[in-house]
Amino acid sequence: MSLITYLIRTHVAPKAALALLAIEVFNLFNRGMPWRGELVWTVDWVGTALVLIGPVLAGAAAIDAGRLSRAGSEYLMPGGGLVSRAYVITWLAATVPAIAVHLVTVTVILLVSNSASQISPWPSAVAVLAQVCGIAFYAALGAVCGRLAGSIAGPPIAVLAGVVLFWQFGTSPGQFSFLMFGRATSSVLGLQYNTNYFLVQTLCLAVLILALMTLPVRVIAGVRRPPHTVTAVSIVAIVAALVLFPSTKAERFVPVTVAPTSCTGENPRVCVYPDHERFLDDAHRAAAQLRAAGAALGVEDLLPTELRERTPGAGPAPDARGRFQIPVESFSFHSPGLTMNDLATQMILPFHCPLLYGDRPPSMEFAEDLNRASYTLLKAGGATGDPMMPPESDMSKDELRETIESFRNCRFR
């Protein structure tokens, strides 16, 4: 019997890879696969699965390691190797199948995403490496819990430890979180992975894995535990981590320059980022319908002849060309695509005005004027299913023209 066959037959963790695969598949289709087209968002999305994969894997590894903690169980490993070697093989039996499942998922999700991103793929590769180290860390954590607490108490302790560690060291944006592998729930276009962040994260995880796998365990007063010196050092290290990590400022992403180079049409000309090229036809169709509505209302000359997609959080537009941002809900494959309702407000909104980006938001009167102007344009275009709150009345042609002109000149009520 080969070692691989033996491990599959006698260990729980390799079989748990099927459960991990189910988690990965669920994560793949969750929320309508909104990440399609964006490289960084795609990689970050697949990393969110570790929130569930980690504790499940830790629990499975604890079962197998716990069985080896029983006296006389060395016979479970062929070849009669040392117990330390047996634990390493048991850890590998949990780690390798889980990593294989994850890497297959990463490959599939990247093929589905079919990203045409303008940014370098290497930082994303480093982020995937950190995810792989995260999987290995959770398996090592489970193995230690099994060694210390056995095959009955060890698994629930390992699962709980995985959850607690994630909430403590994996949920703090803006700080270094060594268990944060993905949290992007909306477009991160215009951002790139911070390679230094993920290299440090990978190094921290590698050190922790080494420490967990080489942890000495002794039977002291009938209880399996590390020596007193190791216990004291571990307590100091945990306290230091609780104090140090929350105060260490670090960003997972850094800004990167991208340009909306995928364009179509003339008057209006619509340009999107290559990552979002699937929205190009819908955006052009909606913009053309809105310009036709503007012509019927006598304001076509005030509407932009070119619309360019903007990144989330972008500052004032440096030119007079129109801007638009794809709504979050439109990224799902359940969405009907971009419509006039999505672009009407953005065709009127003066993205070049610094007043829109200050600490104080524009007045309620500005919001009311914008709502009425957008509603008037949509009504003239025959839009249906308007998601906005309909105003008490739409605008006359003269009032609409005056409002849009004041917006273009950054004059707000």
Q: Residue locations for each model-derived region?
A:
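Aromatic- and glycine-rich beta-strand/loop motifs that create alpha-glucan
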Residues: M1-A17
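Central hydrophobic cores of alpha-helical transmembrane segments
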Residues: L20-E24, A153-F166, H228-A237
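Secretory targeting signals
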Residues: E24-V56, W91-A153, V159
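Helix-loop-helix units of permease transmembrane domains in multi-pass membrane transporters
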Residues: G59-P97
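Membrane-embedded alpha-helical segments of integral membrane proteins
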Residues: L160-I220
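Internal/C-terminal transmembrane anchor helices
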Residues: I220-V254
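Acidic/histidine-rich, surface-exposed loop or edge segments in extracytoplasmic proteins
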Residues: T261-E277
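Extended repeat-based interaction scaffolds and adjacent low-complexity, acidic/S/T/P-biased segments
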Residues: Y273-H284, R291, G298-R413
